[in-house]
A protein has these predicted regions:
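Glycine-rich phosphate/cofactor-binding loops in nucleotide/flavin-utilizing enzymes
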Residues: 23-46, 120, 140, 282, ...
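A short, Trp-centered hydrophobic/proline-enriched beta-strand micro-motif
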Residues: 164-172
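A short core secondary-structure module
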Residues: 195-240
Length: 615
């Protein structure tokens, strides 16, 4: 059974409650932040890569892509102009085809396929506006009830959300405080009869607000930390403002939501009282991860548009793809995308397996998501910035035509900008990445203290071992050794500077930014090199392409790593020690010697032949 017919059969089985092998197709979990201390030679066979998708996962992703091609693409103009009923109608159609139910347990009308599969599906919709609406519904709108709802709440709401009968929204952000869950001003006061919480306040920039039937709302009860509530949008006292006029994702509904003495039954408190901030943080981690996966696929789409255009457009008597600077752009777009998607789906698989291991234990489920907070933030930041790079270069390749609305790269450029802002700005996520690293060290979850003396001795000696050895394919050994040296100097520099700042370290935001940049590049190329190593070990027919993509991703990241290390040392080490520490780190880090121009030309040729992403 092939293609669409297989997809249809699979979805029929799923919607009828039949089990598939999908629910168990996940690699063993690696601990959070393990990428920093585990060599690629050990991790390569443990991590999940897209090449490990089974037939069912491929079919489901294909069905989402088919839905996008048949239902979304023909309606792009109507979506962008917010023609009445178009977006909610598309969401309901998606529900009819099972595309809203992937994360929902079977007991409540869902497919129960898990985070990994839902991330694959969410990344296939190819339209920023629909992707925003779909994510607001399935991730931040539905998952709080899946993860933290009572049995009664799940029975009451999840079947409607899974089918698309109801559409969900997530109301956290407020005027003046953004997404600071600890600074909310919306209040919830218990009524005199003890039957209701009375909500008063304003929420801002709420996706799906114009047509949502249900909202996850965060508000303070007294002066304590915020609590979460399941709120039906048609209850008295709830209203919305006008649609916001936006730069991009114009077709998504974005409004303010007002609560004026809105009565919410006490049984609609979600999770524990005063613990809503935990729900907010953990659901945001899932949202960040899915955003990263979607951004990576968005980069693929931008590359596909650009690569195809270079085979059609001529300048100075030659096709665009024949020019060296165009080859450079195509190759770099492909390599950066490869790294971004590698880290995103690796993280999705780890979170899914950890949650599955937690079972019905709510506290363990909280911890399972929190375990990968660093990786989720990295996936979001790196994925969104790779997308920004890809669409920007896409517009540049199209030239003046890329500035015209008739060409899809123009819309892709506008829609991409928001990705660096929502689910926490990239600046906030960088601080989350570095801050969480130090909290993991201080709690003993990450044993950098114990490792530091060995790493310090290596760095001071200037002699790095052969980290790769025979376990790594010959073509990747130089890149892997460069990566492992980068891990060592990242740990060395971070711990040296941490000893200077001690408890005040999180106030040094510039240092935290440098460190986050290092962690982002290390995780990205660790994921890329592990994926390429895995491809070679299993004899993948595209292993040569994997190698080129991973090598170029490493070469590009290595220069950024060197720059961030230099600037971190120059600005945070005592002045009389700077010269010595710079010399020490530079000597140990060394170089990653590679003819990047030759590699870019080789990779660009594959991109042009494929008319897009080479895998």
């Amino acid at each position: 059974m092939q293609g669409r017919d297989a997809c249809v059969a699979l979805w029929l089985n799923l919607m009828q409650g039949e089990k598939t092998s999908m629910s168990t197709t996940v690699k063993p979990t690696e601990a959070g932040t393990a990428f920093l201390t585990t060599p690629v030679s050990e991790s390569a066979d443990k991590i999940f890569t897209l090449e490990q998708r089974d037939d069912e996962q491929r079919w489901i992703a294909e069905s989402a892509a088919t839905f996008a091609q048949r239902e979304i693409v023909p309606n792009v103009e109507a979506i962008d102009h917010q023609e009445p009923g178009v977006m909610p109608g598309l969401l309901k159609k998606a529900g009819e085809q099972g595309l809203l139910s992937i994360d929902v347990p079977e007991a409540y009308g869902g497919a129960e396929l898990g985070l990994l599969t839902s991330a694959m599906v969410a990344s296939e919709f190819r339209d920023g506006s629909f992707g925003t609406a779909h994510g607001a519904h399935t991730t931040i709108g539905t998952l709080p009830i899946v993860f933290y709802g009572t049995e009664a709440q799940k029975q009451q709401y999840l079947p409607k959300l899974a089918s698309g009968e109801w559409i969900a929204a997530y109301a956290l952000t407020e005027p003046g405080v953004g997404s600071d869950a600890m600074g909310l001003s919306t209040r919830a006061e218990l009524s005199e009869d003890g039957k209701y919480y009375i909500l008063n306040g304003t929420k801002q920039w709420i996706s799906n607000a114009g047509f949502a039937d249900l909202m996850i709302v965060f508000a303070r009860i007294g002066k304590e930390r915020p609590s979460a509530f399941i709120v039906e949008a048609n209850w008295p006292g709830i209203s919305t403002g006008a649609e916001e006029r936006k730069m991009g994702i114009k077709g998504s509904s974005t409004r303010q939501v007002y609560f004026e003495n809105a009565k919410v039954p006490v049984e609609n408190l979600l999770g524990e009282i005063h613990k809503g901030y935990k729900i907010a943080f953990n659901i945001l981690n899932i949202g960040r991860l899915k955003l990263g996966a979607g951004a990576a696929v968005g980069s693929r789409n931008a590359l596909n548009l650009a690569a195809t255009y270079t085979t059609e457009r001529k300048a100075f008597g030659k096709f665009l793809h024949e020019f060296g600077l165009i080859k450079k752009k195509l190759a770099r777009m492909a390599a950066e995308t490869y790294a971004a998607e590698s880290e995103a789906f690796r993280t999705a698989a780890n979170i899914e397996q950890a949650r599955r291991s937690a079972g019905e234990n709510t506290e363990a489920a909280f911890n399972a998501i929190e375990e990968y907070a660093i990786e989720a933030s990295i996936a979001k930041v790196h994925g969104s910035e790779v997308l920004a790079y890809a669409v920007d270069e896409g517009v540049q390749i199209f030239g003046g035509y890329g500035f015209m609305q008739e060409y899809p790269i123009e819309k892709a450029y506008r829609d991409a900008r928001i990705q660096r802002i929502y689910e926490g700005t990239n600046e906030i996520n960088r601080l989350v990445t570095s801050g969480t690293l130090f909290r993991r060290v201080m709690s003993g979850k990450l044993d950098l203290m114990a490792r530091f003396p060995t790493i310090e001795a290596r760095v001071k000696s200037g002699q790095a071992p052969d980290f790769a050895g025979e376990a790594i394919p010959a073509e990747l050994r130089t890149a892997v050794n460069a990566l492992e040296r980068a891990k060592d100097v990242t740990i060395y520099a971070a711990m040296r500077i941490a000893m200077k700042y001690m408890q005040a370290i999180e106030q040094e935001q510039e240092f935290m930014d440098y460190l986050a940049n290092l962690l982002i590049d290390v995780y990205a190329i660790d994921s890329a090199l592990a994926r390429a190593t895995q491809a070679v070990r299993r004899g993948d027919e595209n292993s040569a392409t994997h190698i080129k993509l991973a090598q170029l991703a490493t070469w590009l990241a290595f220069s950024r790593i060197r720059l961030n290390l230099d600037q971190m040392i120059m600005t945070n080490i005592n002045e009389d020690q700077v010269e010595k520490e710079l010399a020490r780190i530079r000597a140990y880090l060394g170089d990653f010697l590679l003819n990047g121009v030759t590699l870019q030309r080789e990779l660009a040729a594959i991109v042009v032949e494929k008319r897009g992403y080479p895998l």
